[in-house]
Amino acid sequence: MREIVHLQTGQCGNQVGTKFWEVLSDEHGIDHNGNYIGTSDDQLARINVYYNEASGNKYVPRAVLVDLEPGTMDSTRSGPLGGLFRPDNFVFGQSGAGNNWAKGHYTEGAELVDSVLDVIRKEAENCDMLQGFQITHSLGGGTGAGMGTLLISKIREEYPDRMMATFSVLPSPKVSDTVVEPYNATLSVHQLVENSDETFCIDNEALYNICFKTLKLNAPTYGDLNHLVSLVMSGVTTCLRFPGQLNSDLRKLAVNMVPFPRLHFFMVGFSPLTARGSQSYRAVTIPEITQQAFDSKNMMTACDTRLGRYLTCAAYFRGKVSMKDVEDQMQSFQQKHSTQFVEWIPNNVQTAQCDIPPRGLKMSVTFIGNSTAIQDVFKRIAEQFSAMFKRKAFLHWYTGEGMDEMEFTEAESNLQDLIAEYQQYQDASALDEDIEGEYIEEEELVQE
């Protein structure tokens, strides 16, 4: 079967990742010790995508947990899911990266990377037909960002033809953890542009907004935010894990979603999201959840989709839904909002469907969009980056670990290029004939 090996790096990556395994185990009827306690054959039909069957009918996640300090690992190990993971798959250092990208990428992380790759190799050898890798990490810190991108490039070297999907938590202006986030994020995006096949961008600010405005929570915790992320991760991977009518895998998703290789940064959304007390007052219908899924208030990336245009998008429906209704809904949405879609990619909305809804819901939809509006997020990071880099603020922390200023300049210009590319395709219309020409020239330059 088409297996996926899951990696989680750094504090954020491990917390989001652990939440993801919680949701996954619940959906597949696996208890905290890896025993199957489910009731439906569908739960086991494609369970080996994410789980390895060990002796005594135990199911073990194909997960590798990485961090440069033991703290998060210890809490995972002593938490409810501690008995689920394979003990050898916890790989951690002692020193921490101190939110320093250079430590994660060049010094501390580089020392640990070989032992992580050994574990990854073991997991990959356990697969019949490895489909690819997925990694959860944040881009603002040291381990998830620095060591995460180091792992991605090493895996890329060793498995060049396998898919690489990343769930990346971007730093956001209102929810800032450290002052050097713009540096770490710019250096990370510089790596992701080259080495990832699909990056699902998630940011804390958007998650907070959903918690406050939609879910009506007064004091959302990181647990609430991680729960939202895990809903999306579970939705994105539904088609890979359950038998369904229209199945999709990481590669099909990329083929449908990535019109140009560098533009693989997606925004994600999930619907229905309702405040706890008000669920019983509304019937969830296909038009309603489709409407909510496309609403920019529901996006887990803080940018306004109405200001950009969709190059492509995908909607994964779960539950007993009629495909005809779904197709009609998607058609009517596209016609109503035709200006939000580029006209030079016909049929740029893909739908897939799976019969099994998430726990507690009759139906749900996960939305994935490749929109030019995502440049807002990159612009925000680029502005903060250049404000600090102009004055060379905090740079000594990075040069002290052996980095060169040149690398910062390169990362900055790569980010600016990415923003310009998104803008170029946003402005392009079907009548511009030279866009294809420009693109081909760019390709040739890259290959030289």
Swiss-Prot record:
**GO CC, alphabetical:** cytoplasm; microtubule
In which residues is Mg(2+) bound?
69
GO biological process annotation, one example: microtubule cytoskeleton organization
Cofactor(s), names only, from the UniProt record? Mg(2+)
Protein known as:
Tubulin beta chain
Quote the subcellular location field of this record. Cytoplasm, Cytoskeleton
What the protein does? Tubulin is the major constituent of microtubules, a cylinder consisting of laterally associated linear protofilaments composed of alpha- and beta-tubulin heterodimers. Microtubules grow by the addition of GTP-tubulin dimers to the microtubule end, where a stabilizing cap forms. Below the cap, tubulin dimers are in GDP-bound state, owing to GTPase activity of alpha-tubulin.
